[in-house]
Design a protein with these regions (language model features):
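Sec-dependent signal peptide recognition
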Residues: 2-10
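N-terminal signal peptide c-region/cleavage motif recognized by signal peptidases
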Residues: 14-16
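Beta-sheet-dominated interaction scaffolds and their linkers
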Residues: 19-42, 140-153
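Asparagine-centered strand-capping/turn motif at beta-strand->loop junctions
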Residues: 41-46, 156-164
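Solvent-exposed coil/turn segments that connect beta secondary-structure elements
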Residues: 44, 57-59, 82, 88-92, ...
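Short acidic, flexible loop segments centered on an aromatic residue
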Residues: 45-62, 164-176
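Intrinsically disordered, low-complexity Pro/Gly/Ser/Thr-rich segments with frequent PxxP/GP/PP motifs
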Residues: 62-94, 176
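Terminal connector regions
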Residues: 92-137, 141
Length: 176
């Protein structure tokens, strides 16, 4: 009973948050034939601007620069507006026989007002997959790639093997 009362009190005291930054995608696929790739950022809710910073990292997340440039890498996003980040390839060093994975990070920092007291503002960071798809690969092959993935079990360890040139996301998996 005490637990139920505590949960009810917490639920009643929590105020919903209707403001923030939203992105129009959960991943970006950059086709080699395209001039660039883009993602749209939307600021909604409160009348508060955001400072938005974006950058790319390679799949190993080491300090090696990604062969792309993001424009703009840093900008002010006003309340209730939409902005587009463009990703452009600047190097020919990418493999042409398989997809390549990079991480697109987008950090949004809300503006603070000196007149506001006792208010917590939280910066958010979204990390999305940027998948480089060379011209030799097509979307139809990507949807068939999951059929070629094999799984092997060694006790408590399940290992998946992807022999395809495609990056595969696993949303759900069932093991019998």
């Amino acid at each position: 009973m005490k637990l139920l009362r505590s949960l009810l009190l917490i639920i009643c005291c929590v105020h919903p948050v209707w403001a923030g930054i939203t992105l129009n995608a959960t991943r970006v696929i950059y086709n080699e034939k395209a001039k660039d790739a883009s993602i749209t950022i939307n600021a909604s809710g409160e009348n508060r601007p955001y400072l938005v910073q974006s950058w790319l990292e390679n799949s190993e997340r080491n300090n090696e620069p990604a062969p792309f440039v993001i424009t703009p890498p840093l900008f002010k996003l006003m309340a209730n507006t939409t902005w587009q980040i463009r990703i452009t390839k600047i190097s020919e060093s990418l493999p042409r026989d398989r997809e390549s994975l990079f991480w697109l990070s987008i950090k949004a920092i809300p503006a603070s007002d000196s007149t506001e007291r006792n208010r917590m503002l939280i910066a958010t960071k979204s990390v999305l997959k940027l998948i480089w798809r060379p011209e030799t690969l097509d979307a139809a092959g990507a949807s068939d790639a999951v059929k070629q993935v094999t799984a092997t079990s060694n006790g408590q360890i399940l290992t998946l093997h992807n022999p395809t040139p495609y990056v595969i996301n696993i949303g759900a998996m069932r093991v019998n």
